[in-house]
Amino acid sequence: MDIERINDHTMKFFITYIDIEDRGFNREEIWYDRERSEELFWEMMDEARDHDDFFIDGPLWIQVQAVDKGIEVLVTKAELSKDGQKLELPIGVDKIIDIPLDEGIESLFQQELVEEVEEQTGTNFNEDGTFGFLIKFNDFEDVISLSHRLIFEDIKDELYSFEDRYYVYVEFDEVLHDEEEIDRILSIILEYGEESTLTIHRVSEYGKQIVKEHALETIRNNFPAKT
């Protein structure tokens, strides 16, 4: 792990996915499992303290960015304002910005993580407790083959075309579908396509929606399976 001290208030970390795995974590759980991500974070902070006497004596402002080979974490010491209603963040010599606590610092950080995961993996998290996956197919014949292989219920699926590729968006309700079932369905889908790095928001906005609902069932009913 690389540690760089930006100034008296800020430290910058870069840790590779290989290093993360060597520490007993995996790249998925640091985004999805809050307890494990906090465990990794405090392990990093302990090293920062030993490395450069970066002691924590108050609230922190944390920015996380995913890059190709790992993650970058920027940690800035903050202070509560005298009235206790704002966080004061130093951004330069004699410069401070105020962030109202009622904006929900924790929710802002969590939303940044969610947006970063969506951008990196094509996974979409929704406020209603559902989450979706966007799968890319290079050939429509692969979508046809999948439609005859996989039959499911209570799962939202849509079909899009974008930049000469086809995309199937599937959305799961974690109340109706357990992790084992979701993994089974995704493993079958990924035999025919690959997880997209695009988000459903981009594909739905700039691409063309071919089938709005029951996409695989519609394809199965209109295109015979290849023998």
Swiss-Prot record:
Keyword Lyase (UniProt): no
Keyword NADP: no
Gene Ontology biological process terms from the UniProt entry: establishment of competence for transformation; negative regulation of establishment of competence for transformation; negative regulation of sporulation resulting in formation of a cellular spore; sporulation resulting in formation of a cellular spore
Spans traversing the lipid bilayer: none
Key words of the record: Competence, Sporulation
Pfam families: MecA
Alphabetized GO MF terms: protein-macromolecule adaptor activity
InterPro entries with a match to the protein in the record: MecA_C_sf, Neg-reg_MecA
Family: Belongs to the MecA family.
Entry function: Enables the recognition and targeting of unfolded and aggregated proteins to the ClpC protease or to other proteins involved in proteolysis. Acts negatively in the development of competence by binding ComK and recruiting it to the ClpCP protease. When overexpressed, inhibits sporulation. Also involved in Spx degradation by ClpC.
PANTHER family according to UniProt: ADAPTER PROTEIN MECA, ADAPTER PROTEIN MECA 1
Domain commentary: The N-terminal domain has binding sites for ComK and probably for unfolded/aggregated proteins; the C-terminal domain interacts with ClpC.
Oligomeric form and interacting partners: Homodimer.
HAMAP family reported for this sequence: MecA (MF_01124)
Stated name of the protein: Adapter protein MecA 1
Source organism: Bacillus cereus (strain ATCC 14579 / DSM 31 / CCUG 7414 / JCM 2152 / NBRC 15305 / NCIMB 9373 / NCTC 2599 / NRRL B-3711)
